[in-house]
């Protein structure tokens, strides 16, 4: 405001610093997203290099505050920097099962709304995922989750949104379920969600900035189908888990919610599974996939 008279129509920029020097520790950069912070760090380190070079000859002297203001609020500079703020800008979102149909389509939605997006999945994937990061992680193993969340926190400064999406469908009737099948289903469809949430909550509590955790549960949790108990049992338990987390950690400003998705073609709901589920309900595949009030098939991007 000291220089407002130089450009009375100028709207003040975000006053938060982009570079922070902590004596004895180092230089830190901030931004609305990871890329902005990286650019700020590049500018900062280059500026330091110029200063050091200047001191090797004589001394470094910065331009005046008035000159800085005129440069920062130059109309052409303002036009270059003008951007639309997106609804999730500044957020860091972690999605488990991120390479699956639902996980990846969800990731694209969050990316388009300005969030930093990190995908977790249990397969080796070396291809570049434009605009997103990928970490190989088996979310049924607590130690792997711990390592990955530490890496994400170190790189991005924390997390804000967790979408616990990983899942696995097994069709069995109650009389055909053996211990191995039930253990496998509970491992991915219940315990994996609990492990990821439990460790994420600890990070969100330390950050003291709230947060949001969303579970991909299933219609099976509230409206079970025949011969699908091996999948429905852990999903029904997951619905309870979501409510319990909300009761215990809502006081920290952390929100918990769940989506009860139904009949969506994905790596979980394969053609084979869909065919079996349609047969179990005595329906054609088309009628089964459009079995809702709108009579339309629901797709991952929906």
Language-model segments: residues:
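Active-site loop immediately N-terminal to the catalytic Tyr-X3-Lys motif
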Residues: 175, 223-229, 251, 295
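Residue(s) in the substrate-gating loop at a strand-loop-helix junction
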Residues: 218
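The catalytic Tyr-X3-Lys active-site helix of short-chain dehydrogenase/reductase
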Residues: 111, 192, 224, 229-237
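Active-site helix of classical SDR
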Residues: 197, 234, 242
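Conserved glycine-rich cofactor-binding loop
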Residues: 99-100
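Conserved Rossmann-fold SDR core element
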Residues: 158, 249-266
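Catalytic Tyr-X3-Lys loop
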Residues: 168, 175-195, 214, 238
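Alpha-helical segment proximal to the catalytic Tyr-Lys
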Residues: 202, 247-248
């Amino acid at each position: 405001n000291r220089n407002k008279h130089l450009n009375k129509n100028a709207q003040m920029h975000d006053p938060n610093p982009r570079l922070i020097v902590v004596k004895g520790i180092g230089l830190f950069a901030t931004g609305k997203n990871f890329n902005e912070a990286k650019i700020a760090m590049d500018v900062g380190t280059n500026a330091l290099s110029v200063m050091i070079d200047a001191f090797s000859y004589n001394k470094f002297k910065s331009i005046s505050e008035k000159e800085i203001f005129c440069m920062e609020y130059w109309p052409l500079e303002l036009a270059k920097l003008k951007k639309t703020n997106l609804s999730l800008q500044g957020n860091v979102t972690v999605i488990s099962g991120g390479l699956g149909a639902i996980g990846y389509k969800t990731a694209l939605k969050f990316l388009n709304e300005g969030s930093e997006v990190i995908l977790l999945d249990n397969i080796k994937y070396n291809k570049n995922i434009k605009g997103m990061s990928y970490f190989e992680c088996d979310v049924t193993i607590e130690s792997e989750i711990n390592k990955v969340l530490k890496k994400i926190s170190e790189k991005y400064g924390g997390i804000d949104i967790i979408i616990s999406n990983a899942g696995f469908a097994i069709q069995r009737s109650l009389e055909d379920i053996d211990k191995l099948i039930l253990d496998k289903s509970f491992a991915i469809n219940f315990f994996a969600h609990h492990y990821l949430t439990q460790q994420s909550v600890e990070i969100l509590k330390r950050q003291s900035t709230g947060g949001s955790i969303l579970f991909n549960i299933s219609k099976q949790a509230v409206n079970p189908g025949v011969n699908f108990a091996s999948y429905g049992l852990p999903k029904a338990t997951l619905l309870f888990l979501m409510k319990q987390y909300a009761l215990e950690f809502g006081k920290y400003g952390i929100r918990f919610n769940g989506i009860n998705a139904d009949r969506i073609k994905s790596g979980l709901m394969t053609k084979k599974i869909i065919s079996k589920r349609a047969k179990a309900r005595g329906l054609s595949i088309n009628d089964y996939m459009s079995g809702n009030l709108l009579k339309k098939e629901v797709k991952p991007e929906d």
